[in-house]
A protein has these predicted regions:
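Histidine/acidic-residue-rich, glycine-tolerant segments that coordinate divalent metal ions
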Residues: 65-66, 73, 90-98, 102-103, ...
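Acidic/His- and Gly-rich active-site-bordering loop/insert found
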Residues: 2-129
Length: 251
């Protein structure tokens, strides 16, 4: 039976090879930032609808979507085992799809179609497949927003693929927490009475340095990064420039 499933999956994807490649190229050539993925949303939902999925556009978020194909329920129940394939499609500022979200979208759509074809061919197989469009992965935490809005409440298994240097299966992931920290001080004239002030910039620099020094005690799977709040790129990327502005007064 496993060989038959594999053959069905391979055939479904091979038949659509060119269309799937065109999907990836379209996203590559039309990069859109987090929560602005209008072209990607429209292309992907039209594509999945043409493949027989029931599509909810603008699902819980303006550029999210849910494309579903439902097979039969478990015998004697109304429960339908549900697999969600997560589809990412937002790009990065300045460098477009350097993180490969065009490929993630292609893989997710291909996987969703392959599962749908298996459910169609093997009608006794219970199950439902959902291709869930999850915008804003690079910034704004799109999946977290969807979780909070209940997008995963009827999902039993969620999976996705990410391009990398090697092929492998990863079943555990690191959680992420994004913080914005602001330091507040008290202003004073730096030339005539600096002792009357409290420099919030000093506090920010010391905090950054202490966190950086802490890295030598962090385990290899732990990551901490930061950026200036004026930097354009997300904090997960190292800063390529670090502007400082100051003044020197000497006799």
């Amino acid at each position: 039976m496993e060989d038959a499933f594999r053959a069905t999956v391979e055939e479904a994807i091979e038949e659509r090879r060119q269309k799937l490649h065109q999907l990836s190229r379209f996203l590559w050539e039309n990069p859109e930032l987090a929560l602005e993925e209008v072209k990607a949303h429209n292309y992907l939902t039209d594509f999945l609808e043409s493949e027989g999925f029931s599509v909810q556009r603008n699902y819980l978020l303006p550029t999210a979507f849910r494309a579903e194909y439902r097979g039969k329920a478990e015998p004697g129940t109304n429960v339908c085992p549900t697999v969600a394939v997560l589809c990412e499609y937002d790009a990065l500022p300045d460098i477009g799809h350097a993180c490969g979200h065009n490929l993630i979208a292609e893989c997710s759509v291909a996987a969703g179609i392959a599962i749908k074809e298996a459910l169609c061919k093997y009608s006794t197989l219970p199950g439902r497949v959902v291709v869930l469009g999850t915008p804003a992965e690079e910034n704004s935490g799109g999946k977290e927003l969807l979780i909070r809005k209940g997008a995963f409440k009827d999902v039993h298994v969620a999976m996705m693929a990410h391009p990398g240097k090697r092929t492998g299966l990863k079943y555990a992931f690191t959680a992420t927490l994004q913080l914005t920290v602001r330091f507040f001080g008290r202003t004073a004239h730096a030339g005539s009475s600096p002792w009357d002030g409290v420099n919030a910039g000093d506090a920010a620099v010391i905090a950054y340095m202490n966190i950086s020094l802490l890295r030598q005690q962090l385990k290899p799977t732990w990551r901490v990064s930061g950026k200036s709040i004026s930097a354009r790129r997300p904090s997960v990327y190292l800063m390529t420039s670090g502007p400082l502005k100051g003044r020197s007064r000497t006799p």
